[in-house]
Amino acid sequence: MSNSLNDQTRPPDSSVVDSTSSNFPNASNDSVHDKPVKQDEQSNPNVREAIANSDGQESLAVKENKDTESSSSHFVPNGVSNSKKRKLVATDLDVDFDISSVRVTEKPSVLEEKSGVIQFRVVSNDDTADSMIMLTGLKNIFMKQLPKMPKEYITRLIYDRNHLSMTIVKDNLHVVGGITYRPFEQRGFAEIVFCAIASNEQVRGYGSHLMNHLKDYVRGTTTIQHFLTYADNYAIGYFKKQGFTKEITLDKSIWVGYIKDYEGGTLMQCTMIPKIKYLEANLILAIQKAAVVSKINRITRSNVVYPGLDVFKDGPAHIEPSQVPGLMEVGWCKEMEELSKKPRPKPFFAVLEMLFTEMQNHPSSWPFMQPVSKEDVPDYYEVIEHPMDLSTMEFRLRNNQYESVEEFIRDAKYIFDNCRSYNDSNTTYYKNADRLEKFFQKKLRETEYSHLAD
């Protein structure tokens, strides 16, 4: 990256900036694992924002209810008899819950920070002893955790005065992780250059807590609202969990030529949410959840707990679902029973469906849509041991027959290999197989199963 860029980075207020909870007045020093929310926290702007968001949903629900009432005066759930009809009125949607009853389960990293085990500090190369100790410790972590990155390159950027580092520090300035970034405040974004946690410290949730500290610090000290970073295949999952996406909405003219480009990396962007303090996100979500549950309980009977059924006291027995107390009231119907019997899709179904759809829609897929006809090619099934085509793959996919991603990839390879085995290399079929396989492997490398690609 050229050193002649016009953008100047904003230096931190001091050589080593303490980013612990003492700099965030809304952060509590309570070390209780399940922390109840205090009544006076309703004055917290983030709490008010959470309730306001919930109230906004309430207003929408009330509006929808009025629209519904104009055509029908009653709200009737599926499977509920006329005697169970209930009019949905706006007063049913009022927020009515004790905010002090909301409990937030805090992660180990948060508890360690509150108890003083770890601290979060923003460090720059200002030639002071403490800064150099922390930057050197962070450099050693990056060198170990990022073995493919040249050591000289890491060293140059860590000590570069245009870069800042958010570090996790234990006793005696012992660094256990951090993020090195370069702010481009005039352009409205910051580039995350390196991000790593020491291998023996990666089970305490440090990574997420570190990113939350970085977001709050950057937004609190600059006008920056966006992050850009290049992530390798192993880091994409982490960045997705932190709100990053592969969809880049920033105009290229803003960042091209300013950030470092890495071969084989995936460019990702994170746009911070206005008015959200990321270190208090768990509190905001807990309050919103409590508000939603409160509203649900006012218009449904989902919170009612019925006693056990006497019919099972004498051993196994059969009972119609309609005879189970409360089931009809929540909208049970026969169709639900049939749906529950259908096999559930595997966790990787969405990925396989995407890969199949991409293959099916590719211009080179036409020869492989249906099984090879025995009438047109009599000896095909004598030569080919494992015949395969896209219609067979689709049948297996729709019927949940793939037990693993590897099985799906194996069937796709059968299509390509069978075609090349039976046809000459100068034929259209052979060339289509090559093109489709190349496209398939490219799409596979874009998923979390990229390690299975050739």
Curated annotation (Swiss-Prot):
Domain of life from the UniProt record: Eukaryota
Start and end residues of each N-acetyltransferase domain: 118-273
Enzyme kind, highest EC tier: transferase
Residues of the active site: 191
Primary localization: nucleus
Binding-site positions, acetyl-CoA: 195-197, 202-208, 234-237
Site (Important for catalytic activity): 191
Chain spans, region Disordered: 1-83
SMART domains the record matches: BROMO
Listed InterPro entries: Acyl_CoA_acyltransferase (IPR016181), Bromodomain (IPR001487), Bromodomain-like_sf (IPR036427), Bromodomain_CS (IPR018359), GCN5 (IPR037800), GNAT_dom (IPR000182)
Polar residues bias locations: 70-82
Keywords from the UniProt entry: Activator, Acyltransferase, Bromodomain, Chromatin regulator, Cytoplasm, Nucleus, Transcription, Transcription regulation, Transferase
The keyword Chloroplast is annotated on this UniProt entry: no
One GO term of the biological process aspect: positive regulation of transcription by RNA polymerase II
Record's compositionally biased regions (Low complexity): 11-22
Transmembrane intervals: none
Record-listed E.C. numbers: 2.3.1.48, 2.3.1.-
Domain Bromo, residue spans: 339-447
Location relative to the cell: Nucleus; Cytoplasm
Entry's family note: Belongs to the acetyltransferase family. GCN5 subfamily.
Domain notes: The bromodomain mediates acetyl-lysine binding in histones.
Protein name in UniProt: Histone acetyltransferase gcn5
Organism of derivation: Schizosaccharomyces pombe (strain 972 / ATCC 24843) (Fission yeast)
